[in-house]
Curated annotation (Swiss-Prot):
Its EC number is 3.6.1.41. This is Bis(5'-nucleosyl)-tetraphosphatase, symmetrical. It catalyses: P(1),P(4)-bis(5'-adenosyl) tetraphosphate + H2O = 2 ADP + 2 H(+). GO terms for molecular function: bis(5'-nucleosyl)-tetraphosphatase (symmetrical) activity; phosphatase activity. The gene is apaH. CDD domains: MPP_ApaH.
Amino acid sequence: MAHYFVGDVQGCFAELQRLLAKVDFNPSRDELWAVGDLVARGPDSLATLRFFQSLGDAGKIVLGNHDLHLLALHGKLKRDKPSDNLTPLLNAPDISSLIDWLRQQPLMRELPEHKVIMTHAGVPPQWSLEVLRQESLLVSQALKQNDYLDALISQMYTDTAERWDPSAIGINRLRFCINALTRMRYLYVDGHLDFDCKQPPEDCSNPQLRPWFEFTSTLRNSHILVFGHWAALMGKVDAPNLKALDTGCCWGEHLTLWHLEKDQKITQKKLKKS
């Protein structure tokens, strides 16, 4: 069995298929792990979701911020923007099935035998593995409830839950987990989240900000952390236990696949429109 990890697909389905063909991916023997943001901006979010749903146990995804936003769009909590290219997906006859499937997906996954942890944006340096498991489980449980739109999705859009508080309860606790695992890039020196700067570290002009992965973390020392979200990094992180896989395919760059067993990255350039 081979374990393949893919960066933010964001509807770039043709590039994904080219990439999987390069490694002769076979769902009967291999697993495809995806760092989230399966949808939005690229030309075929519908085919992308259908494909991952069809993989069954051979597909392992975590939710990204765009995937959570799709839940809000489907629930009529937000309006669809043409630039996101989500109208065909939202109008699809099987949209309810796809949404139900998406709601069953977690914010983190782990591969214990290889000491690999996958989230969309990263892991707060303050968190142990036990805390990560606990907090992501709370969000997953909320997503599976019948009132998930009112109780969670409608209340997740805020920049106020930027500081980890282990005594927080209810929606405030869930908000921090969502913000950290799906939106995080930089932290202030005191450890709270910044939501504004998206530049690569060499271009960040705020001396108070540091990338989340530059803070001391016992989890990062013991595990390989696989993440996406931060396209401006273009996969370049100077640390052996970090695998940054978002390489901006939907922005015209390329899609990246990481073969765990070979510790090898394979890429596919964005295809030109025919």
